[in-house]
């Protein structure tokens, strides 16, 4: 039997009213009836609070990492709270511009930016392009020489050689990675010199990102020291220290908060003699625990002495993290939040994959049944953004809740949406 629901995993405005969970003043069961399932539900006050924390912690220099969760409404919320935003593809850039996000507050990332993406970014007037390779420098030089585009304000992405102590698929700071210029080989120094000497680029600073779901502040401090020591001799004033702050997903996990993370990064850089702007790119730390996903149970299969399967109407197409990273999640019944969670279940999706598991081992009240709405918390990051149409399953809608009101910000995908691209 599991203990009571760990409330630190829930959105900030979560309350129990007559045994039912209410977020943003909205009953989750009623939201499931109104919008259907699966559905992503975001606590808008939680989102704004984390944006405000990041802005305060980094002195207004925080940049939201759009890849964690991006839609027009989220881009506008980020803008209204005074953060910049980092985008890493032409699609993310287009979404930001469509939302009316000021281009000079955008940072354009990507390890393999195409010429068309670079043209789009430069013509839009993005604030910074984070240069990731010598091939990218060649492309920028070419666009300047042949089309007169530029010069471009750039940050040089370096690979500091830091172990982030996280899953190998989201570790990016070690030497063996596709990202950036490696410090240990001298490539980082070479890249900075080239950028400073090139007429097509204005070298503004250095960027590093060591990975995602990082809980050890010392890993961040180590990266910050390396970035600072590389930047200072070249007179580069801006330091962008990436994102990656971990968040708890299951009971028993804990993580530093945004203020503690900022203190570690900024304090380290100041101690090294950095006097210029220090930026960071929180994504998951802002959106992950702001949301939960509601599903409806369709089938219960009990194998005596083995396990009980709860099959729901979503799965790996709306949350691929368990399949990709072995990520764990909690589960609960919004209609019975305070009830003892005495029945162990494995929550699976509707896809034709044995690995389509959302929760490998979760606990629910013993009376869970077909038709019940269940919820998985901490799904605000890399669920909607990494979702797919696997097996032609339509993508779920996204709903923002605040002050007792709900609003649809991304509608449920329909079959007709998938047919629109077909030309055969």
Go through each PLM region and give its residues.
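A charged N-terminal "starter" segment
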Residues: 1-153, 189, 193-203, 404-424
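Charged (often Lys/Glu-rich) extended helix/loop segments that serve as interaction or gating elements
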Residues: 275-424
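Short glycine-/acidic-enriched loop or helix-start segments at secondary-structure transitions
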Residues: 74-75, 96-97, 118, 140-141, ...
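Active-site beta-loop-alpha junctions enriched in small/polar residues
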Residues: 46, 67-71, 88-91, 111-113, ...
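Active-site loop/helix belt of alpha/beta enzymes
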Residues: 2-3, 9, 143, 160-301, ...
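General structural feature for long, well-ordered alpha-helical segments within catalytic domains
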Residues: 27, 31, 43-46, 50, ...
């Amino acid at each position: 039997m599991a203990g009571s629901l760990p409330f630190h995993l829930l959105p900030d405005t979560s309350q129990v009213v007559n045994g039912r969970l209410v977020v943003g003043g909205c009953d989750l069961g009623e939201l499931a009836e109104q919008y259907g399932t699966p559905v992503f539900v975001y606590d808008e006050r939680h989102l704004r609070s984390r944006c405000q924390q990041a802005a305060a912690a980094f002195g207004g220099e925080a940049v939201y990492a759009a890849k964690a969760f991006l839609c027009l409404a989220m881009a506008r919320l980020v803008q209204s709270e005074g953060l910049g935003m980092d985008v890493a593809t032409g699609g993310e850039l287009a979404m930001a511009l469509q939302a009316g996000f000021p281009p000079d507050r955008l940072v354009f990332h990507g390890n393999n930016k195409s010429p068309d993406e670079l043209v789009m970014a430069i013509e839009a007037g993005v604030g910074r392009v984070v240069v990731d390779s010598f091939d990218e420098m060649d492309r920028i030089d070419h666009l300047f020489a042949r089309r007169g585009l530029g010069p471009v304000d750039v940050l040089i992405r370096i690979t500091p050689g830091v172990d982030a102590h996280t899953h190998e698929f989201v570790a990016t700071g070690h030497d063996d990675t596709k990202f950036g210029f490696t410090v240990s080989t001298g490539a980082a120094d070479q890249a900075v010199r080239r950028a400073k000497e090139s007429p097509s680029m204005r070298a503004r600073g250095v960027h590093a990102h060591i990975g995602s779901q990082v809980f050890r502040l010392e890993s961040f401090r180590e990266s910050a020291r390396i970035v600072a020591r590389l930047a200072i001799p070249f007179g580069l004033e801006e330091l962008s220290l990436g994102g990656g702050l971990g968040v708890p997903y299951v009971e028993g996990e804990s993580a530093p908060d945004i203020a503690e993370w900022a203190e570690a990064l900024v304090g380290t850089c100041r101690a090294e003699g950095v006097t210029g702007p220090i930026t960071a790119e929180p994504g998951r730390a802002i959106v992950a625990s702001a949301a939960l996903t509601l599903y409806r149970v369709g089938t219960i299969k009990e194998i005596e002495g083995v396990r009980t399967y709860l099959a729901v109407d979503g799965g790996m197409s709306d949350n691929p993290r368990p399949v990709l990273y072995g990520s764990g999640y909690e589960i609960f019944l919004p209609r019975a939040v305070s009830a003892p969670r005495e029945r162990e279940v494995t929550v699976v999706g509707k896809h034709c994959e044995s690995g389509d598991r959302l929760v490998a081992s979760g606990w629910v009240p013993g009376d869970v049944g077909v038709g019940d709405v269940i919820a998985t918390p901490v799904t605000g990051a890399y669920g909607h953004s990494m979702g797919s149409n696997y097996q032609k399953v339509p993508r779920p809608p996204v709903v923002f809740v605040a002050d007792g009101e709900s609003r649809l910000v991304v509608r449920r995908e329909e079959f007709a949406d998938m047919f629109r691209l077909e030309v055969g």
